[in-house]
Amino acid sequence: MIRSTTRTAMALAALALPAAALAHHGWAWTEDEESRLSGTIESISFGNPHMHIKLKASKGVWEVDLSPPIVAERSGFGPGAAKAGDSVSLTGHRARDHDLLAFKAETVTVNGKTYDVYPQRPKDLRPEG
């Protein structure tokens, strides 16, 4: 009986993992409409599974997800392209839950250059800069 319960629990956990991964890695948590976000980079991470920026903007500090590093680096946005203290302008999608200061960026404009970190996604807004 214990062995059966353990197997059932493991099977349910295995089924739940892909759903959790899709919730984080997908776009369902974001608004459909594109928007802009500008501010100053507080920190930037070029690690897997997604690059990440903490961005100080007028309404607070935002958590910004970008593409996986390999995709961003193909656009030219890799280590050295941006650093803490740089001003940045983003286009992308904010969280559907407006209590969260969370944003998923499609383009990053920093130091006079625009990087399309999600080149496969259609875009309605043109980057500023």
Each predicted region: which residue ranges?
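Bacterial N-terminal signal peptides that target proteins for export
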Residues: 1-10
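Short boundary/loop segments of OB/S1/cold-shock single-stranded nucleic-acid-binding domains
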Residues: 21-35
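Conserved hydrophobic positions within beta-strands
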Residues: 39-41
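Short aromatic-glycine-enriched beta-strand elements
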Residues: 47-56
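Short nucleic-acid-contacting surface segments enriched for D/E, G, S/T with interspersed K/R
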Residues: 74-90
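OB-fold/S1-family single-stranded nucleic acid-binding modules
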Residues: 95-119
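Extended, charge-rich, solvent-exposed interface segments
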Residues: 115-129
